[in-house]
Swiss-Prot record:
Entries under HAMAP family matching the protein: ATP_synth_gamma_bact (MF_00815)
Record's protein name: ATP synthase gamma chain
Locations listed in the record: Cellular thylakoid membrane
Quaternary structure and partners: F-type ATPases have 2 components, CF(1) - the catalytic core - and CF(0) - the membrane proton channel. CF(1) has five subunits: alpha(3), beta(3), gamma(1), delta(1), epsilon(1). CF(0) has three main subunits: a, b and c.
Organism: Rippkaea orientalis (strain PCC 8801 / RF-1)
Gene: atpG
Length: 314
C-alpha cells in the first residue's frame, strides 16, 4: 500500500515547484514586453540611418567609391558571431542556435574557408570551449535586455577584425523572433556591406497582449517609407566622408537589432518552457491527488474490515 505521508509530501513539493515556474513565466512575459518596447524605441533612428545610407550609396554607386567597409575581397577567413543565452530553462533555444552555428561551420569547411568564433552568451562559450573550437573573443554576463553600449563594444571588435583583414567576412548567427512558441536561427552577413544589404524592407513588430486570460502575440507589418534625396542636393561634406562616418553606426545598429531579437526569442522560449512546466506540474498534482485518495480509501476500507472481523470473532 502506498505511503500516504510520502504522497502528501510529493504533492506539496510539486505545488511549490509550480509556484516557482509560474513566477518565472510571469517574469519572462514582462521582460518580453520590455524587449519589444526597446525595439520600437530604437526604430526611428534605425530607419533614418538606413534611409540616408541607402540614398547615399545609390547616388554614388556608379562613381569611384572606395571605402574599407564596402571592400569585397577574396574570402579566406570568416568571423562567426554566435548569440546564445547565459542561462538555461528556455527549451531548445540555445541548442538550436548552436546547431545552426555548427552547420555553418561545416559549410565553410566544405568550401575550404577558415572561421573564427565570437561567442555572445555563456552557453555558446561553454559549448565551443569544451570542443576546443577556434574562439577569437567571448562576451558573457551581458544585460538580459541588450544595450547600445554593449552592442557598440562588440561592433568595435568586429570592425577591428575586418579592417585589419584578420577576417574577410563577418556573419551574425542569432535567433529571430517569430512567435511565443516559434523562433528561427538565421545567419546574417554584417561585413562587408553592399548596396543590396542596405535596402529597406517592411519590418514586423510583435506585441505581447493578454486575451481571454492567456498571453498572445500580435504581429504588425510596418511599411517603411524611403524618401529619395533630390538629385540637385549639395553636400557640405564629401558624400564619401559622410558614408565613412555613418557605416560604423549602421553596423552597430544592425548588431543591436540582432541582439534584441535574440533576447526576445530567449525570453519567449523561457516563458513557453515555464508555462509547459506549470501545466505538467498541474497534471502531476492531479495524478498524485488521485493516487492519494485511492490509497486513503483503501486504508479506511482495510480498517473497517479489521473492525468487522474483530466484532465477528467476539
Amino acid at each position: 500500500m502506498p505511503n500516504l505521508k510520502a504522497i502528501r509530501d510529493r504533492i506539496q513539493s510539486v505545488k511549490n515547484t509550480k509556484k516557482i515556474t509560474e513566477a518565472m513565466r510571469l517574469v519572462a512575459a514582462a521582460k518580453v514586453r520590455r524587449a519589444q518596447e526597446q525595439v520600437i524605441a530604437t526604430r526611428p533612428f534605425a530607419d533614418a540611418l538606413a534611409n540616408v545610407l541607402y540614398n547615399l550609396l545609390n547616388r554614388l554607386q556608379y562613381g569611384d567609391v572606395s571605402l574599407p567597409l564596402l571592400q569585397q575581397r577574396q574570402v579566406k577567413t570568416v568571423a562567426l558571431v554566435v548569440v546564445s543565452g547565459d542561462r538555461g530553462l528556455c527549451g531548445g533555444y540555445n541548442t538550436y542556435v548552436i546547431r545552426r552555428a555548427e552547420q555553418r561551420q561545416k559549410e565553410l569547411e566544405a568550401q575550404g574557408i577558415n572561421y573564427r568564433l565570437i561567442t555572445i552568451g555563456r552557453k555558446a562559450t561553454q559549448y565551443f570551449s569544451r570542443r576546443q573550437a577556434p574562439i577569437e573573443k567571448t562576451y558573457v554576463g551581458l544585460n538580459q535586455i541588450p544595450t547600445a553600449d554593449e552592442a557598440g563594444s562588440i561592433a568595435d571588435e568586429l570592425l577591428s577584425l575586418f579592417l585589419s583583414e584578420t577576417v574577410d567576412r563577418v556573419e551574425l548567427i542569432y535567433t529571430r523572433f517569430v512567435s511565443l512558441i516559434s523562433s528561427r536561427p538565421v545567419v546574417q552577413t554584417l561585413l562587408p556591406l553592399t548596396v543590396q544589404g542596405l535596402e529597406v524592407e517592411d519590418d514586423e513588430v510583435f506585441r505581447l497582449i493578454t486575451r481571454d486570460g492567456k498571453l498572445r502575440v500580435e504581429r504588425e507589418t510596418i511599411a517603411q517609407e524611403v524618401s529619395s534625396f533630390p538629385q540637385d542636393m549639395i553636400f557640405e561634406q564629401d558624400p564619401i566622408q559622410i558614408l565613412d562616418a555613418l557605416l560604423p553606426l549602421y553596423i552597430n545598429n544592425q548588431l543591436l537589432r540582432g541582439l534584441q531579437e535574440a533576447a526576445a526569442s530567449e525570453l519567449a522560449a523561457r516563458m513557453t518552457a515555464m508555462s509547459n512546466a506549470s501545466d505538467n506540474a498541474g497534471q502531476l498534482i492531479g495524478t498524485l491527488t488521485l493516487s492519494y485518495n485511492k490509497a486513503r480509501q483503501a486504508a479506511i476500507t482495510q480498517q473497517l474490515m479489521e473492525v468487522v472481523a474483530g466484532a465477528n470473532a467476539l
